[in-house]
């Protein structure tokens, strides 16, 4: 009996610290997972600031931002990343997007305050279809007028090339086929690969913008006070 008590004492002396040590390790592991999750949350917040459908500080808008969000679309033959910087002194509220061809996987950012920039993407329709990413988006400005941005990334570069355009319409006007046709055919559409500057003729605003010429297109536009 005496030997059994000694044995039991030695067994407990060895087992209890080990048990506590194991428990301590598990606790550390749990904390590490929590920290990892917190970091993932922080990364998600940082990521959300540079994904399509988001609004970022206007000063952050650059082609490298558009390259990043374009990559997120994946391997699609015709796609475009659009960034529009609001330096108009006005607040913009989204109206809608009209597509001549293609679609988008994100929602047009609803509100764009002054000194902010919206990020948006479009792509050709999924599947083996000979279509491009072509359309126009519209925002109502706090002046009461509408800002329209046309973009065209065609499928057939033997017949067409990338084009873009911007116009301010009187009053509230949703994007539709008529608006698209006017901006594409009758309002001096802008060619890619060179910086364009143009007075917009209303609300004392002008534009400065650039579009790349390939099928993975990037379009950056700054709307500024004249």
Curated annotation (Swiss-Prot):
| Region ranges (N-terminal region) | 58-77
Q: What is this protein called?
A: DELTA-alicitoxin-Pse1b
| Location of the protein in the cell | Secreted; Nematocyst; Target cell membrane
| Gene Ontology MF: a single term | channel activity
Residues annotated as region Trp-rich region, which is important for the binding to lipid membrane?
152-167
Which controlled-vocabulary keywords does the entry list? Cleavage on pair of basic residues, Cytolysis, Ion transport, Membrane, Nematocyst, Secreted, Signal, Target cell membrane, Target membrane, Toxin, Transmembrane, Transport
Q: Which organism is it from?
A: Phyllodiscus semoni (Night anemone)
Q: Which family does it belong to?
A: Belongs to the actinoporin family. Sea anemone subfamily.
Q: Which domain of life is it from?
A: Eukaryota
Q: Which residues form the propeptide?
A: 22-45
Q: Where is this region: Plays an important role in the hemolytic activity?
A: 50-59
